């Protein structure tokens, strides 16, 4: 299975030890604060300062989440009403559209293409009727394509959001996978006026099943999200918070060793992609290889089905992420080297 981006590697031992020791605390099994432990929020604030040079107030500008995915729903409930419109990338994470529909708002897809480096076409966006658009989803580093984005792009996006009074949300869980220059939209001057950012410990620290993420932004936006969240759960489990605190303290050597594993796997996946006649961007970042199928292939899904039934290998068809994913397939790096080599061998 080369489809799902669920890290198969273990967290650092210090993370597991911190959780184990937390079980001995007398309040470990009680309800926890909706805002999380102050120590966790401070750890997240320090993480943003160290890696992105972004200053955040730990009391008002950051909110721990049970995974950043729940933040997508919280944000929709906090800021959207029936009939509002939301700009959603095509291709992009399917949950953006699903959540918009759940709150009876309207998804408006905007095109991302290889010709434009998988970045928004601002000229095309400005031609749209934006009067009902309340929110815009972006995701850089981009999933599924691995486009890194840039501070210059973020500046354009912040200017666009200010001009049209749109709340901009950057979904940013892939900053630290095979990416030498992690960036945050909150690095841009004035971004806090119009932007929120979601982040996650899932891919960064191999903790997908722990469900730890965060949303960052100005106090007014965070308070609106908290009003929703406080009616959805009763706080994050204490032991998980303690483990997350330990993870956030890890040195940069953690990312270096992780990248060594992923770089080796990626090189093997490049070989597999070449066997399938695909082309790809070797400079893409993140947890996936986004590969373009040969021009002779008319359907990504049909191509994948044939491989699934004949070789017993699953690869994600690009169409899962939108119509602009047609002609592409996505490999996950969350597959052991031996299994990738086995997959390569099945093609002779």
Model-derived features with residue positions:
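N-terminal small-domain helix-loop-helix segment of the aminotransferase-like
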Residues: 1-66, 74, 248-250
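PLP-dependent enzyme catalytic core of the Aspartate aminotransferase-like
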Residues: 46, 54, 126, 297, ...
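Conserved PLP-anchoring active-site segment centered on the Schiff-base-forming lysine
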Residues: 78-100
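A short helix->loop->beta-strand "cap" motif at the edges of active sites that frequently abuts
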Residues: 84, 105, 163-167, 191-193
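Active-site phosphate-binding strand-loop segment of PLP-dependent enzymes
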Residues: 108, 112-183
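Conserved glycine-rich beta-strand-loop-beta hairpin in the small C-terminal domain of fold type I
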Residues: 245, 261-270, 280-292, 325
């Amino acid at each position: 299975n080369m489809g799902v981006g669920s890290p198969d590697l273990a967290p650092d031992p210090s993370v597991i030890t911190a959780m184990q020791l937390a079980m001995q605390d007398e309040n470990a099994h009680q309800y926890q604060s909706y805002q999380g432990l102050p120590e966790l929020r401070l750890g997240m604030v320090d993480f943003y300062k160290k890696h992105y040079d972004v200053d955040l107030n730990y009391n008002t500008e950051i909110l721990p989440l049970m995974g950043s995915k729940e933040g997508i729903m919280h944000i929709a409930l906090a800021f959207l009403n029936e009939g509002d419109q939301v700009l959603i990338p095509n291709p992009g994470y399917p949950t953006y559209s699903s959540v918009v529909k759940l709150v009876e708002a309207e998804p408006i897809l905007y095109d991302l293409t290889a010709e434009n480096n998988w970045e928004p076409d601002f000229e095309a966006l400005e031609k749209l009727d934006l009067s009902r658009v309340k929110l815009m989803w972006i995701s850089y580093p981009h999933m599924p394509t691995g486009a890194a984005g840039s501070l210059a792009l973020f500046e354009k996006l912040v200017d666009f959001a200010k001009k049209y009074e749109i709340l901009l949300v950057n979904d940013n869980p892939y900053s630290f996978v095979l990416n030498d220059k992690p960036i945050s939209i909150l690095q841009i001057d004035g971004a806090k006026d119009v932007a929120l950012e979601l982040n996650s410990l899932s891919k960064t620290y191999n903790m997908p099943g722990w469900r730890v993420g965060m949303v960052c932004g100005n106090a007014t936006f965070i308070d609106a999200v908290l009003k929703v969240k406080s009616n959805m759960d009763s706080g994050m489990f204490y032991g998980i918070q303690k483990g997350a605190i330990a993870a956030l303290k890890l040195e940069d050597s953690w990312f270096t060793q992780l990248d060594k594993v992923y770089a080796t796997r990626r090189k093997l996946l490049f070989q597999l992609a070449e066997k399938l006649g695909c082309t790809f961007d070797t400079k893409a970042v993140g947890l996936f290889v986004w590969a373009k199928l040969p021009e002779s292939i008319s359907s990504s899904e049909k191509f994948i089905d044939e491989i699934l039934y004949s070789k017993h290998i699953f690869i994600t068809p690009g169409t899962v992420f939108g119509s602009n994913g047609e002609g592409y397939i996505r490999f996950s790096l969350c597959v052991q080297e031996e299994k990738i080599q086995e997959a390569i061998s099945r093609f002779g």
